[in-house]
Amino acid sequence: LFRTSTPCFGSCWGLQVATVAAGGTVRKNPDGREIGIGRRIEIAEAGHGHGLYLGKPRIFDAITVHLDEVETLAPGTTVLSTNAWSPVQAAEIDTPGGGGFWGTQYHPEYTFREIAAVFRRYGDILIKHVLFTYAAAPAAYSPALHAALASPAPRPLVWKYGLDEAVLDPAVRSRELRNWIEQAVLPARSTRGRE
């Protein structure tokens, strides 16, 4: 796929697989699993003005779940955002065919419903890694995440979990996907004579 002019996008494992396919490496994050809300993701210098982040705040939170992370950048990689948990939260990889790859470590495609399901699925693992201290805690957190789907989200919930527009507003939360379509896919499509 990288040898074609087709633009590619991937989140989480998508970024990791693309990194390895392009010659970089991935490792288990020594800080453990980043899960729930990835905090204070900051657009890097190279990310300012990049198509992925048009209309996105300079520092934002995002729904996330990952244990692995990019360790060594592949040749032709530009880091677009970072945070204290993982130095590569988003990247662009130049590809031989010119289509390019844009990827995020976090999940702009997730809603609170998806991350709530992840908490239920990983409950025992989260307790083992001391992200929760008692067995019922992950399951108890799930209804709170479902409640965040309401518009507007309940104010006590917003305060308790430190949620803001970047994760609560679907248009802001998924902006990277729309930007990729508008900034990479549609221009590539039009160069192929497709409207």
Task: Kindly give the residue locations of the regions a language model identified.
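Cysteine-nucleophile active-site neighborhood
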Residues: 1-47
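Amide-donor transfer/coupling interface in amidating biosynthetic enzymes
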Residues: 3, 43-195
